[in-house]
């Protein structure tokens, strides 16, 4: 059977499987993917790999620590001599000649002692291999752990911290840039970096015919590229040209190569003879500011392309770099795009911890070496190693990095990077997942970001193109898509496997040409050659689909550059795709379950990288695949999986404006109050919200079904009517049914914890002069202690309000250190926790519970970005009601839909209405009930006709309209009202937390204006728009009172004659008696001085201008 027959058989098998079967298979395959990897496996896998392998690699990279007593590490020179002996040179004659080789006396290790010592403490990631809660199942929940908790975060000093995945530049490939024209061999180690640059020859005699020359930057020095070729063993110019092997007739390229040869002749005339080129390279390297201690041969062996062994291989790789640069300059090769994910790697907890520990371990080593050096410089003997090694260096360094969020820069040792660690959000389980799947690109906001904020084609299927914050982080902070998977570091060596697939070895010889063979690059290293790249790549992919090669291996065949690039490193974004040519295997065996590992082993699914996907032809779905199966090599599981976890659960998201979906996915879903954990009674969060009666929506999405997580929805199903109601639901306001709220709708509780700690008597860190602070009840002048017991803590159920002492602390002398409830804080004591921390201090936490029912000013939102505040609470008897007696819970304004372009909410209400109502029997059908349409998955939603027919079968209007009666008059309303169930969310923005009221209060000492903090009795933020509103309403007296009298009222003196500012001074008039008052120094009189009332901010501005030498003239009028 030939290839055409095989393809036709595969096409027939795919068509015979049917659309329904394939869609069901895609759903089960996605479910098995989430069961295998979950949503946060990238965080756990990275940390586990660091613990099992990366940590040991860090210590092995430092090698042995050598401490010599004659070396002063502070002065970086030999130390002082204690016992000096003067030697003089004498001549010794011997009658024997030296024959044979030199012999050396090696140092012999007399004693080897091994012992376990504490180097430092490393935080343990929750649910990792080191965590005691890593076990799964009901037993874990019985121990008090949360059933929603998937781990992936750290607990640092009682706060939950999470790593934000960092997008860093890939160092596993050559980097070609056009500004300036360079090709770089990047490495995290500075000495291993190598750059070839094509620049103008500044030493040319005729600047009009100045040609570009090739130079290299190696070990902080600049060397002509032709000299480096000969230093690596190239014997002739022709051999160097053959290594470059530029296949083109561009005159500018030829001139650049000739100019490069001339430049090499200019700096070293006889570089082709002997070792002159190597000598010149040695001279340049040793002339740098910080020359290496190794010889030039060792420098070329250790620092120049350390992945290649042999100078001839290094010369060949240098010729390859030059060819890449010249091809890009001639327009035959594209420059690298820094915004493409093919040129990026995702750094997670393992890589970030490894880099940070390396910095602190180097610090601890230097500190230990200095202490041992000081001990050896004296007469004393060395003490045990733990006496010199300070374990707090690593422990405190990591704690400081977690607390401040500033971590080591990946390429610059002296700089720190912020935004690496953030507090884990706990408003609801969805917010927690979003924080764990977030990525961040580090750029300078002050400079030109370029296209970094814009979506890139490489984001497709790996990064959600809607989930990004607004503001300065827009486009820089992203969220991984549902099926996005971060690759882990491969442990097994694949080089030997590549030889079995047809790869030829790269010989250490520059005289043999490649003869049209293609280069094979493994993680950026040139490992071999292949004669037929097409068959070689086909064999690699076939073996990968049979699990003979790593499943996360990425294989790219570049026909234009004659390269085969293979990647097995960590940090690449992968995603699963259906392999079309292997779908016929599903017909042979149709199990009820599809383990994801089994699908990968069978080659039905494979993990595709970004570069490999460039050669794939992917169908957008099963429907598109079945139309033309021959045209596609791969197929998507579902288009909704291209979105992030917060976007994929939005119903009818493809019908809404993108901005509204962004608001829901990035703001509202993270601010929605839900049920954040199953163990709230044992947690001591600073602030948490819990919804009393959370519900799941009536509709379903494919993502929520595959994830099997109903807790991703945080809200309740409300009957929503689209109508105007007494004008109270204009401008983002909604009207709610008061009776529904009294029945418990959207009722929640807020739990706030207050924490305090005290030192124990045996605490080492407490200063000796400080008094010991202990918990206890004492008479307090700052607040009331009526609810406190003798131990200083309130009793359970105590009703506490503003001014009460919540935790009593005092010293032996009676000094009060208690914690008082601030302004607007109140609640009922729910629990009191007393424990101790790792630092030996006792700490206490008191949690206050407060029930919050919706009130005016609270914020609500649907899942379509339709946000609004509660503007009016209407009695149920005054609400409009339908013929069946249904009274809506919420009434929103119809003008909210055209401007915000959210027809998806109307479709959701119509679909939910058809789901909630009973389905009538279909005439002429044997089935008792027709099949319900429940799915509202983005990009595969049911059509409008299907939704309207479902409503019609249920006995309702096709378009969801209802005939209603006026609740106030009982008359039937003329117009029909659209009504249906809609999933609404209550957000954390509540008026009780934001309302401000004050007459006068604390002011800023400089501007004398009210402070901003609400808990400090601060004022409200009053801007130009608020001022314009009061002016439009004619409330000038209120405006004058609020902005002047109760804010920063002040006065200043003006001279009406010269119109300048008059100071209040103390002077002695002709009468001889000292007086103090306003006086105009310009007019030398106080006769025309008047007093005016101005805000102190205006007066301060005038005084600052006066100090700058700017004089102001004031016109005054009598009022």
From Swiss-Prot:
It comes from the Eukaryota. GO terms for biological process: DNA-templated transcription. It is an enzyme of class 2 (transferase). DNA-dependent RNA polymerase catalyzes the transcription of DNA into RNA using the four ribonucleoside triphosphates as substrates. Second largest component of RNA polymerase IVa and IVb which mediate short-interfering RNAs (siRNA) accumulation and subsequent RNA-directed DNA methylation-dependent (RdDM) silencing of endogenous repeated sequences, including transposable largest subunit. Also required for full erasure of methylation elements. Required for intercellular RNA interference (RNAi) leading to systemic post-transcriptional gene silencing. The lineage of its organism: Eukaryota, Viridiplantae, Streptophyta, Embryophyta, Tracheophyta. The gene is NRPD2b. It comes from Arabidopsis thaliana (Mouse-ear cress). It catalyses: RNA(n) + a ribonucleoside 5'-triphosphate = RNA(n+1) + diphosphate. Belongs to the RNA polymerase beta chain family. Zn(2+) binds at residues 1055, 1058, 1080, 1083. GO terms for cellular component: mitochondrion; nucleus; plastid; RNA polymerase IV complex; RNA polymerase V complex. It is found in: Nucleus. This is DNA-directed RNA polymerase D subunit 2b. Component of the RNA polymerase IVa and IVb (Pol IV) complexes. Its EC number is 2.7.7.6. Disulfide bonds: none annotated.
């Amino acid at each position: 059977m030939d290839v055409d027959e095989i393809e036709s058989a595969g096409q027939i098998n795919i068509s015979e499987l049917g659309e329904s079967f394939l869609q069901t298979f895609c759903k089960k395959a996605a479910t098995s993917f989430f069961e295998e990897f979950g949503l946060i496996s990238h965080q756990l896998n990275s940390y586990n790999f660091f613990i099992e392998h990366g940590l040991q690699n860090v210590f092995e990279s430092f090698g042995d620590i050598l401490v010599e007593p004659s070396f002063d590490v502070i002065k970086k020179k030999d130390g002082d001599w204690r016992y000096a002996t003067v030697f003089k040179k004498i001549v010794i004659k011997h009658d024997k000649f030296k024959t044979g080789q030199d012999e050396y006396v090696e140092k012999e290790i007399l004693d080897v002692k091994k012992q376990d010592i504490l180097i430092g403490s490393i935080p343990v990631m929750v649910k990792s291999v080191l965590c005691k809660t890593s076990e799964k199942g009901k037993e874990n929940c019985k121990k008090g752990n949360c059933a929603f908790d998937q781990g992936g975060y750290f607990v640092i000093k009682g706060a939950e911290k999470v790593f934000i995945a960092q997008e860093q530049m890939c160092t596993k490939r050559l980097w070609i840039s056009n500004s300036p024209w360079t090709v770089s061999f990047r490495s995290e180690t500075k000495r291993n970096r190598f750059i070839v640059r094509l620049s103008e020859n500044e030493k040319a005699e005729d600047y009009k015919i100045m040609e570009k020359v090739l130079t290299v930057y190696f070990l902080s020095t600049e060397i002509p590229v032709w000299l480096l070729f000969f230093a690596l063993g190239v014997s002739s110019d022709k051999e160097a040209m053959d290594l470059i092997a530029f296949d083109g007739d561009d005159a500018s390229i030829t001139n650049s190569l000739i100019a490069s040869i001339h430049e090499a002749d200019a700096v070293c005339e006889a570089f082709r003879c002997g070792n002159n080129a190597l000598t010149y390279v040695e001279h340049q390297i040793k002339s740098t500011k910080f020359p290496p201690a190794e010889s030039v041969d060792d420098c070329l062996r250790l620092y120049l392309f350390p992945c290649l062994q042999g100078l001839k291989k290094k010369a060949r790789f240098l010729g390859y770099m030059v060819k890449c640069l010249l091809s890009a300059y001639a327009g035959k090769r594209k420059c690298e795009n820094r915004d493409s994910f093919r040129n990026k790697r995702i750094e997670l907890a393992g890589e970030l911890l490894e880099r940070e520990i390396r910095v602190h371990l180097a610090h601890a080593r230097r500190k230990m070496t200095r202490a041992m050096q000081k001990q050896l410089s004296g007469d004393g003997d060395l003490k045990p190693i733990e006496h010199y090694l300070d374990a707090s260096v690593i422990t405190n360094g990591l704690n400081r990095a977690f607390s401040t969020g500033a971590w080591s820069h990946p390429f610059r040792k002296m700089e720190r990077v912020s935004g690496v660690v953030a507090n884990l959000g706990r408003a609801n389980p969805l917010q927690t997942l979003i924080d764990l799947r977030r990525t961040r690109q580090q750029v300078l906001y002050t400079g030109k970001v370029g296209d970094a904020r814009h979506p890139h084609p490489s984001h497709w299927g790996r990064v959600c193109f809607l989930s990004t914050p607004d503001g300065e982080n827009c486009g820089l902070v992203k969220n991984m898509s549902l099926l996005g998977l971060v690759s882990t570091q491969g442990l097994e060596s694949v080089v030997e496997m590549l030889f079995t697939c047809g790869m030829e070895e790269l010989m250490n010889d520059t005289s043999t040409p490649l003869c049209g063979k293609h280069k094979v690059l493994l993680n950026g290293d040139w490992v071999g050659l292949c004669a037929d790249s097409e068959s070689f790549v086909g064999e690699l992919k076939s073996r990968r689909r049979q699990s003979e090669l790593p499943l996360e291996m990425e294989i790219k065949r570049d026909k234009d550059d004659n390269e085969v690039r293979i990647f097995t490193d960590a940090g690449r974004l992968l995603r699963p795709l259906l392999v079309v040519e292997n779908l016929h295997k599903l017909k042979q065996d149709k199990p009820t379950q599809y383990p994801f590992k089994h699908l990968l082993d069978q080659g039905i699914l494979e993990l595709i990288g970004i570069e490999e996907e460039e050669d794939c032809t992917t169908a957008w779905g099963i429907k598109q695949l079945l139309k033309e199966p021959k045209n596609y090599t791969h197929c998507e599981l579902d288009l909704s999986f291209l979105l992030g976890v917060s976007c994929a659960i939005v119903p009818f998201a493809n019908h809404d404006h993108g901005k509204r979906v962004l608001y829901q996915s990035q703001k509202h879903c993270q601010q929605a109050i839900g049920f954040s954990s199953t163990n709230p009674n044992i947690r001591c969060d600073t602030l948490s919200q819990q919804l009393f009666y959370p519900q799941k929506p009536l509709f379903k999405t494919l993502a929520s079904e595959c994830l099997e997580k109903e807790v991703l929805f945080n809200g309740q199903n409300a009957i929503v009517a689209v109508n105007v109601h007494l004008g109270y639901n204009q401008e983002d306001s909604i009207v709610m049914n008061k009776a529904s709220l009294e029945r418990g709708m959207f009722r929640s509780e807020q739990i706030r914890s207050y924490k305090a700690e005290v030192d124990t008597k045996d605490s080492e860190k407490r200063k000796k002069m400080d008094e010991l602070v202990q918990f206890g009840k004492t008479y307090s002048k700052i607040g009331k202690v009526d609810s406190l017991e003798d131990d200083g803590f309130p009793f359970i159920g105590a009703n506490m309000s503003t001014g009460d002492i919540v935790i009593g602390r005092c010293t032996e002398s009676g000094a009060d250190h208690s914690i008082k409830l601030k302004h607007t804080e109140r609640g009922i004591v729910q629990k009191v926790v007393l424990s101790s921390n790792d630092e030996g201090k006792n700490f206490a936490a008191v949690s206050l519970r407060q029930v919050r029912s919706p009130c005016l000013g609270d914020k609500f939102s649907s899942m379509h970005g339709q946000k609004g505040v509660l503007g009016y609470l209407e009695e149920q008897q005054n609400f409009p009601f339908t013929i069946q007696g249904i009274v809506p819970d919420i009434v929103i304004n119809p003008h909210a839909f055209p401007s915000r372009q959210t027809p998806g909410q109307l479709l959701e209400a119509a679909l939910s209405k058809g789901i909630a109502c009973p389905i009538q029997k279909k005439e002429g059908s044997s089935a008792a009930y027709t099949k319900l349409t429940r799915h509202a998955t983005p990009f595969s939603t049911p059509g409008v006709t299907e939704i309207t027919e479902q409503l019609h079968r249920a006995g309702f209007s096709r378009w969801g309209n209802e005939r209603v009666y006026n609740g106030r008059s009982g008359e039937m309303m003329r117009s029909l009202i659209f009504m249906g169930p809609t999933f609404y969310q209550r957000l954390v923005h509540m008026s009780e937390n934001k309302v401000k009221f004050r007459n006068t209060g604390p002011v800023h000492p400089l501007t004398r204006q009210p402070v901003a903090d609400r808990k400090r009795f601060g004022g409200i933020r009053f801007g130009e728009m608020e001022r314009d509103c009061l002016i439009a309403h004619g409330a000038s007296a209120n405006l004058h009172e609020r902005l002047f009298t109760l804010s920063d009222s002040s006065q200043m003196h003006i001279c009406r004659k010269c119109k300048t500012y008059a100071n209040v001074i103390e002077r002695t008039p002709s009468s001889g008696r000292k007086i103090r008052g306003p006086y105009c120094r310009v007019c030398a009189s106080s006769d025309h001085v008047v007093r005016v009332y101005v805000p102190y901010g205006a007066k301060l501005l005038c005084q600052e201008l006066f100090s700058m030498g700017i004089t102001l003239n004031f016109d005054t009028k009598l009022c």
